[in-house]
């Protein structure tokens, strides 16, 4: 039986991406990033949606070319319906619907957060994917949550941030340090040359599995303001140690709750997903727990950590196999609950 060929389209934030999947195998995964947001210290929604309009056709054409297929071979089109920036989502949704009509191919809506988690089932991402049930720490600039994954489309959020996401905390603290946006990768890189024990910052005291990252941001801000009064060059002179200390603090907060959830539920299958899953300290903490706690860990390839269409195509493939299609009246939504099947 010939494998289905599915196009995935991702446009939830500031990356325009398209991918082709056949079965569980990714044939192409193309992305256009938007450097324009760096000078503003964050994503500007209006600029993002305009850039998507410019990028979406060349990105899709390139993904088809790289996959070495013809456009009429596409069996279905998967697109990110949400959550995300509404203007950005509308570009991808509208184009997906138009292309589906043109090709007379079925349309498949995809939840962006589910896609991050289910990227672990891409063939080249993980030859041995997680076994159900598993826990997935999903961490990005917009979301931080512990998800109990019972089946492909049966997921339960058992813990989440009550304020800032972990990636957002990295970016806001990076702004305090006068680092470029996005600050997370820069903090990670500078941490390699710093001492993680040089400075200590407050940790939240929350019951259960929920997170809070607004406290560490405030703690760092007050600490820096105090030190700059004594030495205006304090940040510049201590940037590596500051980055290493902040990174250690944030990763410890993330791992403490994840360890508690895994212990309470008796689950050893543990995955991470989302942009912050590229962080070297988080990956190292997972590897240490593999040895210390006997976890079976699942760490995504770097190309599947940030927003990408390969993960959208993967979910679309799973829904295609189930015959779960969307109709042309489907609209983008900025809020889209994770456990919506």
Swiss-Prot record:
It is found in: Cytoplasm. It comes from the Bacteria. It holds the Pfam family TsaD. GO terms for biological process: tRNA threonylcarbamoyladenosine modification. Substrate binds at residues 138-142, 171, 184, 188, 279. One of its GO terms (molecular function) is N(6)-L-threonylcarbamoyladenine synthase activity. InterPro entries: ATPase_NBD, Gcp-like_dom, KAE1/TsaD, TsaD. Its EC number is 2.3.1.234. Binds 1 Fe(2+) ion per subunit. It catalyses: L-threonylcarbamoyladenylate + adenosine(37) in tRNA = N(6)-L-threonylcarbamoyladenosine(37) in tRNA + AMP + H(+). Keywords: Acyltransferase, Cytoplasm, Iron, Metal-binding, Transferase, tRNA processing. HAMAP family: TsaD. This is tRNA N6-adenosine threonylcarbamoyltransferase. It comes from Riemerella anatipestifer (Moraxella anatipestifer).
